[in-house]
Amino acid sequence: MDNKALAKKQLEDTLSTLKQLDDNVWIMQYKSNYGLDKLLDKGCGNIMDAVKFLQKEVNFPALNINPDHSGFACSTFNAKTPEGGFILGRNFDYKAAPCLVLWTTPENGYRSLSVVDTTFFIHGTKYVPLKNAKRPLRVMGAPYMSMDGINEKGLAFGVLEIKSKATKQQTGKKPIITTVAIRAVLDKCATVDEAIDLLASYDMHDSIFINYHYQVVDANGTSAIIEYVDNKMHVIRQEKEDDCLALTNYFLTPGGDNHDGRGYDRYEKIMTTLKDKDGTVTEDEAMDLLSKVTLHYRHPALKHMVITLWSSVYNCTEKSMLMCAGMDYGKKYKFTLDKPCEYTVL
């Protein structure tokens, strides 16, 4: 089979797995080569670099990018489970839209389970169903649209916004944008230290004109916060083994610009709850905590609804994810890394 025929088959195989579970959740197993090594070697300094690469590598369609970044928020935390495992809890807050649960199996990297915000490239500014005849090729860029995920080594990773000046490092290293960095960590890193080292090896260029920070947890229970203040990378680590860390939408690094003040209340709620439970919660208790720090409001300038699109509890020991989407906490989905496109409704 020649390369063109192989690419066509991989495209068809991928799209054949695309399935809608309800109004808030789609699932898909990516069965094509998305060329991460080539992109990292080339460098990716802005969104259009990524789009042009995808157009060449995976038949991604031409489109104009006008990202609406206002209202992106989120919350994360790490904790232990009663069974001795480790979790990353995560709320993703943004413009109301469905999410896509994605399984990837790269040729030169770790398998992963991640969640894609379909607003960025797949739907654009006007919602169109994923299987609309004009849109299916957009899902071929999904590996570079994941906002959080977990890989086969039990490393979980998530991104959150800070309303501050975007990072644009210029130290002579190859550039990397936010969503490509997320994909690189999931595909290449087994531990927190490896994730930190990988991010430090690139010049970070925040994707859409605003600052981002990250929380990472691994199967050993190690967790860290990674932030960029004035174009310098900072790492906040646990003071003691198994300590709980949390992150919302302001800098934890001393000297960071926190004029906005978003997320203080959510951070305090998370940390107080975890302290009261000695840092140990079940997956259901973690989900209950996430349900108490959701967002739901109409954006004052852009007039769209900002909600918690999904709440996920990544189990770094089991390599699984418990998810509620669209703020429907009466329906829980359980996904596992080893069983692509299979799920249980709890």
Predicted regions and their residues:
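N-terminal mature-domain region immediately after signal-peptide cleavage
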Residues: M1-C189, M204, V281-L346
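Secretory/export targeting leaders with adjacent low-complexity proregions
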Residues: D197-S207, Y214
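Extended amphipathic alpha-helical segments with heptad-repeat/coiled-coil character used for oligomerization
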Residues: F209-F251
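Mature, function-bearing regions of proteins
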Residues: F251-G255, R262
